[in-house]
Amino acid sequence: MKQDMIVILDLGSTENTVIARQIRDLGVYSEIHPHDITVEELQALDNVKGIILNGGENRVVDGQEVQVRDELYGLGYPMISIDYPQSKCEAQYQELPDDAAMKAFLSLIHI
């Protein structure tokens, strides 16, 4: 049996591993992937149940703001964003959500 998984997309955060640990401490497997993951690469991952867009202070690279691919929004995965104001997610947080907020997200997607 394969594990359910939350994908964390790195959009310039320094706290990706903190979020991954928080999710794992809640009993759910997570993986960190780069912001420019393609639709095909994401769909090739097993048992993805939700996505966290994790922005941060390192969002600008070579004068360009790091963006998530717009096509990812149309895939039907539940998504939340952390410190990524451009997102089109159901829930947006300015800072790392507490365990209660993260549990609410996980229960929303039935994990």
Which residues does each PLM region occupy?
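N-terminal beta1-alpha1 cap of cysteine-dependent amidohydrolase-like domains
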Residues: M1-L108
